[in-house]
């Protein structure tokens, strides 16, 4: 028997692809509202939202509808796409996902008003729609 210790080799993890790196950042970037003081709505539809059920691990699919009245900042569209894609591997309930999106959006954009609706694809004959709202205090 030899006194040398065998080293176990762990498989090398391949580097992230450029899209995976961008999604991992997932920050909500904003830019100045070009019409501060004007009350207008922005509607964003994100039809490819995915996350994982925290109980079963099965994937959940939804369309996220975001409608907001900007204050001083507007969300950059590519940034919200990448932010939403960051949920794809998270184990999170429908309710928590939509509420977390609202919290993060309000923190990044400080809108006057925002409504976020998660319309989840039916699974097991159950269709879930989660809707949350925020209105800035005067």
Curated annotation (Swiss-Prot):
Pathway: tRNA modification; tRNA-queuosine biosynthesis. The active site is at residues 53, 60. It catalyses: 7-aminomethyl-7-carbaguanine + 2 NADP(+) = 7-cyano-7-deazaguanine + 2 NADPH + 3 H(+). GO terms for cellular component: cytoplasm. Pfam families: QueF. Its EC number is 1.7.1.13. Keywords: Cytoplasm, NADP, Oxidoreductase, Queuosine biosynthesis. GO terms for molecular function: preQ1 synthase activity. Its main location: cytoplasm. It comes from the Bacteria. It is an enzyme of class 1 (oxidoreductase). GO terms for biological process: queuosine biosynthetic process; tRNA modification. It is found in: Cytoplasm. Substrate binds at residues 75-77, 94-95. The keyword Cytoplasm applies. Catalyzes the NADPH-dependent reduction of 7-cyano-7-deazaguanine (preQ0) to 7-aminomethyl-7-deazaguanine (preQ1). HAMAP family: QueF_type1. Belongs to the GTP cyclohydrolase I family. QueF type 1 subfamily. This is NADPH-dependent 7-cyano-7-deazaguanine reductase. The gene is queF.
